[in-house]
Amino acid sequence: MIAFNNAKEMEANGEQGSALIVEYERVIYKLGEGPFTEAQNHIRKEVYRNLYELTIMNDDEEKAKHYKEMADSLTDLTSSED
């Protein structure tokens, strides 16, 4: 996924501001509403965790709470399907 790779590259280059938040939000938008594959679910969880950390660093506690709740609500699809 190009948007996810762009966000990871921005992060690796030291970006921590609103541009990176927008890029991660773009990843969520591009994934749509599902249903999601295991890989997509993993990406969503990682993106929400990253958004949580970024919004905490940018002092936006309301958004941070939302992103943390979204990350915590996702479970791995492999954990209970046998």
Predicted regions and their residues:
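Structural motif corresponding to the intra-repeat A-B loop/turn of tetratricopeptide repeats
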Residues: 13-14, 58
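Residue register within tetratricopeptide repeats
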Residues: 15-18, 62
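TPR/TPR-like (Sel1-like) alpha-helical repeat modules
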Residues: 24-29, 52-77
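Flexible helix-coil transition and linker loops at the boundaries of alpha-helical arrays
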Residues: 29-41, 81
